[in-house]
Amino acid sequence: MAPPSIFAEVPQAQPVLVFKLTADFREDPDPRKVNLGVGAYRTDDSQPWVLPVVRKVEQRIANDSSINHEYLPILGLAEFRTCASRLALGDDSPALQEKRVGGVQCLGGTGALRIGAEFLARWYNGTNNKDTPVYVSSPTWENHNGVFIAAGFKDIRSYHYWDAAKRGLDLQGFLNDLEKAPEFSIFVLHACAHNPTGTDPTPEQWKQIASVMKRRFLFPFFDSAYQGFASGSLEKDAWAIRYFVSEGFELFCAQSFSKNFGLYNERVGNLTVVAKEPDSILRVLSQMEKIVRITWSNPPAQGARIVARTLSDPELFNEWTGNVKTMADRILTMRSELRARLEALKTPGTWNHITEQIGMFSFTGLNPKQVEYLINEKHIYLLPSGRINMCGLTTKNLEYVATSIHEAVTKIQ
């Protein structure tokens, strides 16, 4: 008798919620269906959008006979790393001028977070330090917890961020948690367009946050997934990162180019490292090279080439910023329109938070039962947390979504 499969006892894992939601949406035959869960930009026709500047650069790359398919260096395409870090920090960054910045090309924002987490688990404060507390916001993007756990960190904690009652930032709770955190703890910070709440600190609030972190020697690890995409301004969306650098912080910044270039399946990311001295950067990158070597060995080239060529050419750069603003402006319009319709319907509660939030997502305040009603009765797909992707709204479905939310809030408590 043959022995049972060595895989017989492997348990079935739960599906990734946001991807399961999209699969359910696709299988739904109802013509009214709306997908507000997908984490990607959509046009007013509910279609993916390839940025015109990306099409142009892809064509140029295809026609460039000097390009081959040799391995990139382990740390990635040099021009991409330089351009990406400069985008985050600004051309006039003192850290760049003093050559104490390094970049590592990674597989999207998740890859940048993972390489940063793996490095910190091995070398933070010069030692293997997996007992260091890592703080993530409550709520946060679900991958933040998983990435740091997978890197070996044993103490993942949450810090206050969202005030459900006022549907805004719990600044005092945030500051209190910073004060109570052990010195040298790691804090994962959303650079802009906080996921899932869409609520960001103001510059003055960021200054308060930085002041406590500086005094208590807390390490900032920024996640920058939406630069330019949140407000339409590259500078505004990078304000917090640049302020922390100006205050003398050493920090990591995981950058994603999925949203602001529409390069979701190219997995284009960069980990920007800011240190106090140039020598530190050389040593840090030498260790990150070892980590990358055993993780994916060498990164893919196509997406990095597209981003590098666009960011390094003034004409293409200007076209790209225009494309990004087109996306950001459509999201802002959908926010205004949804709020206006809910208020016109006199939907119970307050809805000003929809326009006060920023970026792709809105934390609506809908409870899980109301979400269940919207999915089952109205075929409107969103996450149980009540988070919606504003890009899923269009001029064609806005009225239906607003009246459905009104119905859910009115009927279901």
Curated annotation (Swiss-Prot):
Q: Which enzyme class, named as a word?
A: transferase
Q: Which cofactor does it need?
A: pyridoxal 5'-phosphate
Task: Fetch the InterPro entries from UniProt.
Answer: Aminotransferase_I/II_large, Asp_trans, NHTrfase_class1_PyrdxlP-BS, PyrdxlP-dep_Trfase, PyrdxlP-dep_Trfase_major, PyrdxlP-dep_Trfase_small
Query: Which parts of the sequence carry N6-(pyridoxal phosphate)lysine?
Result: 259
Q: Which UniProt keywords apply?
A: Amino-acid biosynthesis, Aminotransferase, Cytoplasm, Pyridoxal phosphate, Transferase
- The source's superkingdom equals Eukaryota
Keyword DNA damage set for record: no
The main place the protein resides is cytoplasm
Which amino acids does the record list as binding L-aspartate? 39, 141, 195, 387
PROSITE patterns, per database record: AA_TRANSFER_CLASS_1 (PS00105)
Instruction: Give its localization.
Output: Cytoplasm
Gene Ontology annotations for the cellular component aspect, listed alphabetically = cytosol
Other information:
In eukaryotes there are cytoplasmic, mitochondrial and chloroplastic isozymes.
Subunit annotation? Homodimer.
Cross-referenced PANTHER family, in alphabetical order? ASPARTATE AMINOTRANSFERASE (PTHR11879), ASPARTATE AMINOTRANSFERASE, CYTOPLASMIC (PTHR11879:SF3)
Write the protein's name: Aspartate aminotransferase, cytoplasmic
Q: Which organism is it from?
A: Bos taurus (Bovine)
Write the lineage as a comma-separated list: Eukaryota, Metazoa, Chordata, Craniata, Vertebrata
